[in-house]
């Protein structure tokens, strides 16, 4: 119960249980691996997310008008309206991209040590943050053999299915958002998918190179190769 959880939290002795492995089918026919925490852990993780949202408010404010996922009063509708606003300003060449295996590829040590801890007023919740990102995975024996392969990298990055992960994804990409602002690249990002609008195809191609270089060198992330195929995840298109 809640009072029991509070006692462990006050003493600094709260320990997260193993998560439960589960999969959900994606639109492309593949599966998304989820690591579902127990109910009591979800309560703690949700509270931790609220606390971190407040503590890292200044860091996240750098993503205003850029990031539209996992936030109150923001979503797909607001993202589309922002794109239209930029489009109407004459920037109509669209670079669309998404980050390869984003959640798995997040450097969680860098996330914790370089982005979260320096922005906290004290160290009282450090153990909770570290515990939240190192939960053991359980329940694999209940999955079909073909689904188990989706968990081969469990333990890397930030786990999908964790109530803290949406916020952590925005924290990790906050520097990317700020860098795009400095480059004067009007970007609209929804989680690990983003578009940047340009006035010409030439500037869009240069932008692709700048984005690719920054993500790899600064965050250890890759975007899909630029392609013209119908199913390509990274494209440059004109109206």
Show the residue positions of the predicted features:
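Long amphipathic N-terminal alpha/beta scaffold segment
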Residues: 7-27, 31
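Conserved polymerase palm-domain catalytic core
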Residues: 9, 85-238
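Catalytic micro-motifs at enzyme active sites that drive phosphoryl/nucleotidyl and oxygen chemistry
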Residues: 22, 33-35, 80-86, 183
């Amino acid at each position: 119960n809640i009072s029991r959880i509070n006692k462990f939290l006050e003493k600094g002795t709260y320990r997260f249980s193993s998560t439960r492995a589960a999969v959900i089918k994606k639109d492309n026919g593949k599966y998304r691996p989820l690591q579902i925490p127990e109910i009591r852990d979800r309560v703690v993780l949700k509270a931790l997310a609220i606390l971190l949202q407040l503590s890292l408010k200044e860091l996240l404010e750098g993503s205003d008008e850029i990031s539209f996922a996992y936030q109150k009063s923001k979503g797909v509708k607001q993202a589309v309206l922002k794109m239209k606003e930029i489009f109407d300003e004459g920037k109509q060449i669209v670079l669309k991209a998404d980050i390869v295996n984003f959640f798995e590829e997040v450097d969680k040590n860098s996330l914790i040590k370089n982005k979260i801890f320096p922005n906290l007023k004290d160290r009282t919740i450090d153990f909770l943050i570290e515990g939240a990102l190192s939960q053991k995975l359980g329940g694999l024996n209940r999955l079909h053999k073909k689904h188990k392969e989706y968990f081969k990298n469990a333990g890397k990055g930030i786990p999908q299915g964790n109530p803290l992960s949406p916020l952590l994804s925005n924290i990790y990409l906050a520097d990317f958002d700020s860098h795009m602002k400095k480059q004067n690249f009007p970007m609209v990002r929804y989680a690990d998918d983003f578009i940047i609008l340009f006035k010409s195809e030439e500037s869009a191609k240069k932008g692709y190179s700048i984005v690719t270089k920054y993500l790899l060198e600064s965050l250890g992330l890759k975007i899909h190769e630029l392609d013209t195929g119908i199913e390509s995840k990274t494209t440059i298109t004109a109206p």
